[in-house]
């Protein structure tokens, strides 16, 4: 057995009850929270991301919340670097890092490390986009299928950002995205205890998602997105504006759908996010499952510390 310090992962789909449980652990078990959520990183995006309240954040600080403007980008690599640094600081204080959230790509980057992918090259990307303009994205998808059939099967023709990135990686490095992503980093120096929380029944999760979206609408979500919309420098191609709920509300403000359709699509998009998160989690190794709202969840995690 190694002498590595313990770190806790509290994973789960959106609206599963992670935050309440995490705050209780932080208050009673000398844990410090690191957010693992690609939406909570953005300033000014509070209601639609179900960000912990100001009172909760004052009571229990969450690292990696409100760290960038919605115009800025933040990668899984940025997360890994920040999280490892924070985990070291927390263990140096004699506390336990508690990583909480549902962005499974961030967890994967932290645990498995990052592949040695080349940095973005504006000239190469511009050439790819020029080809797309001339020949269409389908033609570029066909090219990807020839050089990297595994990535082509995974990346949809209507996902130009990922499609362009896969082609860019090949043109810069001469190696496919699939080939490069097989290279892994060394394991991180922690004994990781992994928990996932979710309702037993999918219908319960769906009901929680709908209730939470309704509460967001009642709490001023439209006004929050309108403020972002009126800035004039944000658009739907940004990762921040592709967050569930924000895209639908943005399109409503543009006049491309009515209020009821926005509400319906926002709930559906959130359910689809939860489904993707559950798919990740079902394939995750060494996870202890907790049922949302169960009385002994706190004690089960505490017993592992």
Curated annotation (Swiss-Prot):
The keyword Calcium does not apply. Its EC number is 2.5.1.75. Its cofactor is Mg(2+). It comes from the Bacteria. Substrate binds at residues 14-19. It catalyses: adenosine(37) in tRNA + dimethylallyl diphosphate = N(6)-dimethylallyladenosine(37) in tRNA + diphosphate. Residues 37-40, 161-165, 242-247 are annotated as: Interaction with substrate tRNA. Keywords: ATP-binding, Magnesium, Nucleotide-binding, Transferase, tRNA processing. ATP binds at residues 12-19. It is an enzyme of class 2 (transferase). The record marks 103, 125 as: Interaction with substrate tRNA. It holds the Pfam family IPPT. One of its GO terms (molecular function) is tRNA dimethylallyltransferase activity. One of its GO terms (biological process) is tRNA modification. HAMAP family: IPP_trans. Belongs to the IPP transferase family. Monomer. Catalyzes the transfer of a dimethylallyl group onto the adenine at position 37 in tRNAs that read codons beginning with uridine, leading to the formation of N6-(dimethylallyl)adenosine (i(6)A). This is tRNA dimethylallyltransferase. It comes from Psychromonas ingrahamii (strain DSM 17664 / CCUG 51855 / 37).
